[in-house]
């Protein structure tokens, strides 16, 4: 194992290998492999296959903290989020708090981000445009990628300064006054809590099989 993979690729270094917790016994693999191969990473889904909270706790969080203690970099995976489909979603405050939780509660130091919706249709959304063309996810869900990218890079940003930043971003995007942009940001922040709170109250089972979602 130590030599075969790099040699077969014609490399003298150790290429990165990622262990995904939902299909691998990471502890068993890490205990056996780390003494031989150092460039290993672990990854686990942040809230599962839904976005439910920026205050994670319980058995799911323990999986993260256990993985982050194994001796390599742990990656938080924002997976296919069934409870956000098919709507548009963007809450800078929620995302900043979630990334802080990834660091402080789960011990993660990297992010693997999936599209906000329509993963299997990438790069297109499910939206129908008037001219019949398909809309790109990077255009429709720009705030999704911008928030996660911004706070994955640095989640320790002053909140009041962030409000000013997002007011400017939204004002430029929608062509509004600063006051109107502030109202749009507030709408994003308030609506961003709805799907996570509903699932925390009524969801049964984890993943894209949730009773709440199957009934919608």
Predicted regions and their residues:
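Catalytic-core regions of glycoside hydrolase
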Residues: 1-178, 185
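C-terminal functional modules
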Residues: 167-174, 179-216
């Amino acid at each position: 194992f130590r030599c075969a993979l790099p040699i077969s690729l014609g490399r003298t270094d150790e290429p990165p290998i990622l262990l995904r917790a939902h299909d691998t016994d990471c502890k068993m693999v890490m205990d056996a492999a780390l003494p031989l191969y150092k460039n290993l990473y672990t990854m686990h889904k942040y809230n599962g296959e839904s976005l439910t909270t920026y205050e994670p706790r319980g058995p799911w969080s323990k999986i993260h903290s256990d993985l982050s203690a194994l001796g390599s970099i742990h990656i938080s995976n924002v997976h296919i989020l069934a409870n956000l489909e098919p709507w548009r979603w963007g809450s800078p405050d929620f995302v900043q708090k979630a990334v802080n939780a990834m660091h402080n509660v789960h011990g993660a130091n990297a992010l693997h981000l999936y599209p906000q919706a329509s993963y299997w249709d990438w790069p297109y959304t499910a939206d129908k445009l008037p001219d019949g063309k398909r809309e790109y996810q990077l255009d429709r869900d720009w705030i999704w990628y911008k928030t996660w990218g911004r706070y994955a890079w640095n989640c320790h940003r002053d909140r009041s300064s962030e409000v000013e930043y997002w007011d400017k971003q939204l004002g430029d995007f929608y062509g509004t006054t600063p006051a109107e942009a502030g109202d749009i940001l507030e709408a994003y922040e308030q609506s961003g809590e709805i799907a996570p709170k509903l699932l925390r109250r009524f969801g049964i089972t984890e993943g894209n099989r949730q009773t709440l979602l199957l009934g919608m």
